[in-house]
Amino acid sequence: RIEGAPKGTKGISLFIVPKNRKNTSGALEFNDVTTVADFQKMGQKGYCTTHLGFGDKDDCQGWLVGEENHGLNYMFLMMNAARIAVGRGSSAIASAAYYASLQYANERPQGRKLASDGKKNVEQSQSLIIEHPDVRRMLLLQKAVVEGSMSLVLLAAKYYDLESTAQSEEEKKKYNTLLEMIIPVVKTYPAEAGTYSVNNGLQVLGGYGFCSDFILQQYYRDIRISAIYEGTTGIQSQDLLGRKITMNNGEGLKLLVGEIIKTISKANAHPELKQYSDSLSEKIKLAEKILQTLMPHALKGDFEKYLADASIFMEFFSLVIVGWNWLEIAANSLQALKDENKKYSHIFYKSKIETMKYFFEYEMPKAVGHSEIIMNPSSVTIKKEEEILI
């Protein structure tokens, strides 16, 4: 922050501060940049995370990048790409955990199926745990989260490419707006749901999942930071509800809903998908109801109340966006089966459709609970006069 700069984020400037600098003779000399601490982390131990000290001996120089007081704007040019990268990395870790737990479930015999009388036949061979419904539920959850997360990352890449290759300013603006709308979700859903997914992968292994003999425990430690760095879940949620939803009088939200409606129309061409497209349509109406409930708080300047449950809104909104992606995937897969498209195997397309069903039947219903929390007039999380957290 340059002396005399405005208070708050508007007074932040961007500087390059090298470890070494050139002196007047052109030789390199130390720039008084030191490593103060090496943090001992829970996970992500493949690289160092350090605390740097600048100018401990009052002999450190930095070079201004761009204009004074524009640092935060410059940083966000990098930040959007970094947030997409976090979503991509979270998807990758969750994917590795899914396939590790899937392999284990296909190899580990444990327990027996119940007979029609509700008892186990001890003479029968033990079943592989992948045959047990509860284990299959945990595996399906992982598959739904992992592939749903990857679809978000690919959607962001698609919008970025369409913006970059747009033939008109109007088209460029459209895809930039759509990209801006989904970036908080692309960062947050793979991080939060991915952590939950890896947790289920670890659970598939039982006690072994907790031991270093298997890699699931490392995946769990490694993915946990994803909901923290490059903007915590709370910050992403406030960005979504406080800025993205309201920007340009809701233009971005209207564009996004328009894209979702296109998928619903495509899915409605397949009677097999009607119940799922109807479910997504209902969630869009529910989103409108939520915003109609919240907006009066923003309009009268009560932003604390408006944003109090932003993280819950993020969970709701993420389910809608990922559900949209899954419906698109299922519609394309069903059409490929009907067209006898041989690009991928029959089971590949079938697995996409069945995973979509899991998402809509097990994950999407959570959106209703989230909506009830958000629209509840109670303000239990807002601090009152007396502190009750004792």
Language-model-detected regions and their locations in the chain:
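A glycine-rich, basic-preceded beta-loop-alpha segment at the flavin cofactor/substrate interface
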Residues: 22-36, 41, 48-82, 102-130, ...
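C-terminal amphipathic alpha-helical interaction region
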Residues: 247, 263-390
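Alpha-helical support elements that line or immediately flank enzyme active sites
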Residues: 87-100
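Short beta-alpha connecting loops at secondary-structure transitions
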Residues: 37, 75-83, 124-125, 133-138, ...
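Gly/Pro-rich turn-and-neighbor structural signature
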Residues: 132-203
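A short core secondary-structure module
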Residues: 1-30
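Alpha-helix capping/hinge segments and adjacent helical runs
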Residues: 44, 155, 177-255, 358-384
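Short, glycine/acidic-rich hinge or "gate" loops at secondary-structure transitions
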Residues: 106-121, 154-171, 202-213, 336-344
